[in-house]
């Protein structure tokens, strides 16, 4: 395809949702190096995706819109939506592509942009677009969007998300790194917005103590709302740990994760961010979620999997058509990785921290991070 000046990409949701699209966005950048890539996203995208961090050149915030940008405390404004679409039509996009759902909501959105070519995912009941592939839920999210990018001949050799940690991110955590005095540290990210993806908080204190006994400093990460919960975990430890919850920006968090020798987390945004800065990870996954959200490589990433399928409250096996569905009268609000043992997580961590061949990989990565030149 020639003379492509502007490509709009719709992905207006959360951190992990965006990060898994990065290989596809990189494919678009590689294939169309002179094209402006514009993300139609949320306010956090505009704050985080500053110049140089990803292949995205510009972010335009999408107004609150059912099925596109859902906000708990936000309401739709039809006048704002109309003004948005008029503005987007004046952009004269050559291609509008969506990486968001099965097309029921996203396809009508794309068509209102009046782009020369519309591309994305679709299902039988969705509004038609120019080029599409069928949406089937159970698929690696990374590979899903690479398939979509392939509809405009975009290709890449990179199948793991990648972002750049910038100088301003390094500067933000300089005091923390000075305090640690170059001691190797492991990051634990214990909580998740969706409790069903979170490991039992009580497991983190003994895990953190084990890491301390092995010679690693321990940093906990999370949102400001999770700070108290992390304080409670630390209060049950025999050793000291650092609570960074709510104390850094998303860029600062990326810098912390990049400097860690290992990140241990449930299936949530910071785990995907750690992958994107090339830090070894131990991720705790419910088996159905691993299909979509797990890493594609294993050299420095180890998933620990829960195979416990049934909800203990109602007995339903909630994995069809999506994870945690159907709900009926039960929302299955309990951890679905609760049966993962501390021993299993330790074994996965040991495989990355202490085996000689993995240690060499860690040392190479570690020496190239913010510590040093």
Regions found by a protein language model. Name each.
Residues 1-373:
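Catalytic machinery of carbohydrate-active enzymes
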């Amino acid at each position: 395809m020639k003379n492509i000046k502007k490509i709009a990409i719709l992905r207006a949701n959360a951190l992990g949702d965006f990060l898994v699209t990065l290989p596809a966005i990189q494919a678009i950048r590689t294939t169309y190096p002179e094209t402006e890539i514009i993300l139609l996203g949320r306010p956090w995208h505009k704050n985080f995706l500053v110049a140089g961090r990803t292949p995205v050149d510009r972010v335009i915030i999408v107004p609150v819109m059912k099925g596109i940008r859902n906000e708990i405390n936000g309401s739709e404004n039809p006048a704002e939506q109309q003004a948005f679409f008029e503005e987007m039509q004046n952009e004269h996009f050559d291609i509008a592509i969506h990486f968001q759902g099965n097309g029921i909501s996203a396809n009508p959105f794309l068509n209102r942009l009046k782009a020369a070519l519309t591309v994305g995912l679709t299902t039988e009941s969705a509004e038609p677009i120019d080029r599409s592939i069928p949406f089937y839920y159970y698929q690696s999210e990374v590979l899903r969007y690479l398939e979509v990018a392939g509809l405009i001949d975009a290709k890449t050799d990179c199948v793991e998300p990648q972002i750049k940690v910038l100088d301003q991110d390094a500067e933000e955590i300089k005091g923390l790194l000075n305090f640690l005095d170059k001691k190797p540290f492991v990051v634990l990210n214990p909580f998740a917005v969706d409790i069903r993806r979170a490991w039992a908080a009580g497991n983190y204190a003994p895990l953190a103590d084990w890491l301390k006994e092995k010679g690693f400093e321990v940093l906990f990460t999370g949102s400001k709302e999770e700070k108290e919960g992390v304080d409670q975990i630390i209060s049950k430890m025999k050793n000291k740990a650092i609570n960074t919850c709510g104390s850094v920006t998303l860029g600062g968090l990326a810098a912390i994760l990049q400097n860690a020798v290992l990140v241990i987390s449930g299936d949530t945004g910071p785990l995907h961010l750690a992958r994107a800065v090339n830090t070894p990870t131990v991720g705790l996954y419910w088996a159905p979620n691993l299909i979509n959200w797990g890493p594609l490589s294993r050299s420095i990433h180890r998933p620990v999997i829960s195979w416990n399928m049934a909800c203990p409250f109602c007995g339903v096996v909630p994995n069809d058509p999506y994870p945690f569905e159907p709900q009926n009268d039960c929302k299955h609000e309990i951890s679905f990785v609760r049966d993962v043992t501390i021993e299993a997580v330790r074994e996965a961590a040991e495989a990355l921290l202490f085996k000689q061949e993995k240690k060499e990989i860690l040392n190479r990565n570690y020496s190239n991070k913010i510590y040093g030149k």
